[in-house]
Every structure is written in C-alpha cells, then in structure tokens.
Amino acid sequence: MFDIGWTELLVIAVVLIVVVGPKDLPPMLRAFGKMTQRARKVAGDFRAQFDEALREAELDDVRQTISDAQKLNPVNSLREAMNPLRQMGNEIKADLQKATTVTENKTEVPPDAVAAPTPSMSLPETPPLVATPAPSEPVAAAVVQADTVAAKPKAVRKPRGKIADKVDAAAAVAVPVEKPKRTTAVRKPATLKKPAQTKKDEA
C-alpha cells in the first residue's frame, strides 16, 4: 500500500520501540489497527454509496431511454400527423353534406306548379317538308378552280455547271400534268371463293 519494504518496516519498528518504549507499544499498535479498520470501513461505505449512486444513475439513464423510446413510438407520431388530415376530411364531408342538403331543398318543387305537356302518340297526317338540295354548280366551279391552281408549274432550282443547261432544256420541254377529274369507282360484283382443297379431300 505504501510501497514499504521489509527493511524499512524494521527501521520503523526500531524507532517506535526507542521513542515510545516497549511498555506503551502494544496499546499504541492496537489503537493504530482500530483507526485503520475505521478508515477502511468509511472507505467501504463511501464506495458502496458511490456504487449505489452509479447504479441509480444508470437505471435513471435506462429509464430515460425507455421513456424516450415509448415517446418515439411511430404509431403515436403517425396518429398526430393524421389528426389534422382527419379534421380536414371531416370538414370537407360536412361541407359536402351541407351543399347536398341545400340543393335538395331548392330543387324540390310542388307537383302542382309544373305541368309538363304530354306528347301525342299518333303520327301526323302530312309528312314534314324537306328542303331541296342546292344545285351542284358551285361544286363544279370549285373543281375548275382547283384544276387551274394545280396547273401552275413549280419553280425549279437551277443546278450549277454543265448539267444546268441540260436540266433547263428538260424543264422547258416538260408539260404540266393536269390533275385527273374525280370519278366514282364502279364496284365489281363479288365472286365466291372456292374452298381450298386439302390432302384429305384428295384422298
């Protein structure tokens, strides 16, 4: 404990015998032992109290972490987050119910106030007049105008070099092609197809 060797203890014992004397040395050693025992007991009590305080602090920390974990329950946080949404949904439902009840009250009309005429179930004696179709002259005029527009030749870009002369001569010779008039196609009569022969039919 004090890093005292045997030789040093022997020197201390010799000094105590010389100073205190052989007669008073045993009661003094007993008092010193009791004092050491008391000091150890106080140190043990202090250590026990200190250890108990540490355990309580650790338990408090554990209790605190458990309570934090319970407070951090995701279900509770989701409930708190959904609560405003639930309130908004209830408000919207209430508004919709008010709107539907108001419109139902406004649309209710007493049956005596509105009398719908009953339609007759018989056919009229004279057929209704149908407007005669307009003459087809404007359509023909539109076709003639379309032919004159189509008859205009497109401007041809002049190529460079010797080929340009050949292309110019060919373009001058080309005659603008008139668009053929639209005619209705004649339908061919439907012919019956012969069923295809299979190998089983041949056999």
Swiss-Prot record:
Bilayer topology: Single-pass membrane protein
Region (Disordered) residue spans: 179-203
Subcellular location(s) of the protein: Cell inner membrane
Sequence intervals crossing the membrane: 1-21
UniProt entry keywords in alphabetical sequence: Cell inner membrane, Cell membrane, Membrane, Protein transport, Translocation, Transmembrane, Transmembrane helix, Transport
Subunit comment: The Tat system comprises two distinct complexes: a TatABC complex, containing multiple copies of TatA, TatB and TatC subunits, and a separate TatA complex, containing only TatA subunits. Substrates initially bind to the TatABC complex, which probably triggers association of the separate TatA complex to form the active translocon.
Entry similarity comment: Belongs to the TatB family.
NCBIfam families: tatB
Stated name of the protein: Sec-independent protein translocase protein TatB
